[in-house]
Amino acid sequence: QFLKNKIKSLDAIIYTHEHADQTSGIFEMRPFFWKNKKKIPIYGSSRTIKALTSNYTFCFSPRHGYKPIMEANIVKNKFQIKKKNKVLSVTAFDVIHGMIKATGFLFKKVAYISDCNKIPKESLKNLYNLEYLVIDCLKMDKHPSHFNYHDALKLIQLVQPKKTILTNLHTDLDYDY
């Protein structure tokens, strides 16, 4: 997708959680470092950053003459991503993804929640008055770690964003449903 869309640089990478389906592409970020000659900042919860720096040591520590390609940043609540004169303010909040805490992100009036099956009450406050809600919707049937179609609809009805984008749709959910 990077090649097809002619993406030449990355300002940052934000990780929602440490599962392999979210993190395994980290190795593919090396060309951005090689081209731009500067570390790529990554952001995530302390749990996620700990897993990434442990599982992908070569990205964060010098080894065998290779420079680290990434700079790890632990997020707790509000943080900023800076590039030249521009600043992107981001709010991180907890969501539940099965047996772990994952992270949802709020960018002004856009919320992104990729993998979750429950949103704690204290995190819900971030989801009102949204222009866009990007929300997990894996299947029609119940799932132990993801919202299903009915869970997603309940959340949409509760927070009433102007527009919603369902993500993580599995093969049993037709994209034209």
Language-model-detected regions and their locations in the chain:
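Active-site metal-binding motif and surrounding structural segment of the metallo-beta-lactamase
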Residues: 1-44, 131-132
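Core dinuclear metal-dependent hydrolase active-site scaffold
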Residues: 1-5, 69-125
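Divalent metal-coordination and catalytic microenvironments
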Residues: 2, 17, 42, 52, ...
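Short, glycine/charged-enriched secondary-structure capping and boundary segments
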Residues: 6-7, 27-31, 56-59, 105, ...
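Structural motif
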Residues: 12, 109-112, 132, 163
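Hydrophobic/aromatic beta-strand patches that form the interior of the parallel beta-sheet core
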Residues: 14, 43, 73, 91, ...
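Active-site neighborhood of divalent metal-dependent phosphoester bond hydrolases
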Residues: 36-40, 48-72
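Cap/insert and terminal regions of metallo-dependent hydrolase folds
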Residues: 118-177
